[in-house]
Each structure stands twice: as C-alpha cells, then as structure tokens.
Amino acid sequence: VSIRAVMRVYAERSGDAGARTPKEIFEIAEGIRPGNREAAIAAFEELGEMAGDALASAITLIDGLIVIGGGLSGASKYILPVLLKEMNAQTGMMDGARFGRLQKEVYDLDDEKSFAGFARGEAVEVLVPGTNRKVGYDPCKRIGVTFSKQGANRSIAMGAYVFALNHLSK
C-alpha cells in the first residue's frame, strides 16, 4: 500500500512505461489528462483492496475510528468503495460455511446515509447482574472509516494546540 504500488499497477495495466506520479494517475482517472483511464482507476482500486485487507487485520487489535490521510486520500472516491467492500467481505470455512471477516460492520463516515446507520446503533436495556438496575447497552459492533480533509500539517498543529491547552492548567 504505497504510491509506488499505484505507479506500478498503472504501468502494468496500461503498458505505459513512463514514470507517472500518483497525481498524474489520478488526473488520468478523472479524464483531465490523457492516458488509460481504466488502468488508472484500477490502480487506485487495487490500493483500496490491499489497504482494506490490512486495515481489516489491524482493526481486530484496536477499537477506534479509522482516519486515512496523506496524498493518496485525494483519490478516495476510487479507493474507499473497494476498501469498504474488502473490510465488509465474508470469509469461509472448509465446509462452506460463510461469515463476515470482521465481527464489526464497517461504515463510510463521509456518506450521510452510512453515517446515519453508524450513529443510530441498536441500544437495548440490560439488567445489571445481582441488582434490579437496568443500563443501556448497544450490541451493534461497528467501526467508521473516513478520509482526512485537512492534511497532515494542519492535523498535527491542531493536535499540538489542544495538547498545549490541556497542559496549561496543570
């Protein structure tokens, strides 16, 4: 999962031996620059598939939102659908039984309808063992994926600012 992989896949699929940058490949995918549009889109889709596989493995270890940043995030419209498909994919057993590769549902937080499903949840009340008290519980396991819209420099600066504010009063 890298810019070099996007460049390699585009070169393999298009037959274009020129060293195209990911920005140029994105412009080809958008139809702004001449080149093999299908190969350009496929290069970003393959990145989405590989990133989805890696993130599906990583998210089994942590519980949190996934925010994807960096220069390739500009191509999110080509990457995200395949990434979500990979993360929400099924896997199977030798006997043919199928089940989700993750115990969680993965949601696109940049899509209004998907975000509504993520935010809604399925709250139910459960009895606290040994008491008569009930508490709210949401059995719906879910994870959200989004792309950074502000860039690494701004995100780091904002984080440092909030960190400093939190430590001024100490």
Residue ranges and their predicted role:
Residues 1-170:
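ATP-binding/phosphotransfer module of carbohydrate and carboxylate kinases, centering on a glycine-rich
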